[in-house]
């Protein structure tokens, strides 16, 4: 199973917590980490904390995203997942992107192995009426527009590479 994180150095602690929650249910995972500012100490910390898993650290060049708007709430790293199909090795056919502030409470295998049915993504939504109303109000959406949690995205990398135009 391939799992993708997009982080900066401030999120190492949350990343470790998320990985620990994943390991309660699933093993044999390759973690791909898109980053800009992780140093060797950060990488060693993750690898030593989880010696039974494989880490792939992919440094993203800042100039690739220099014109993207950011704020303290929305750092540059939130955009990396949008370009995952270009940033990740061509040998990968799918990957599960997770925000690192997620605590996993069951195995991810069923989600990971879902059939894309020609879709680019499989995403999670909030289906409860309370959450629909809350998200509509918080994000300025109409009540009948579904809210998609972009913090949990199964990506069809083969289809994304074929269909997405980098210029878009």
Where do the language-model regions lie?
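Glycosyltransferase catalytic domains, chiefly GT-A lineage
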Residues: 1-168
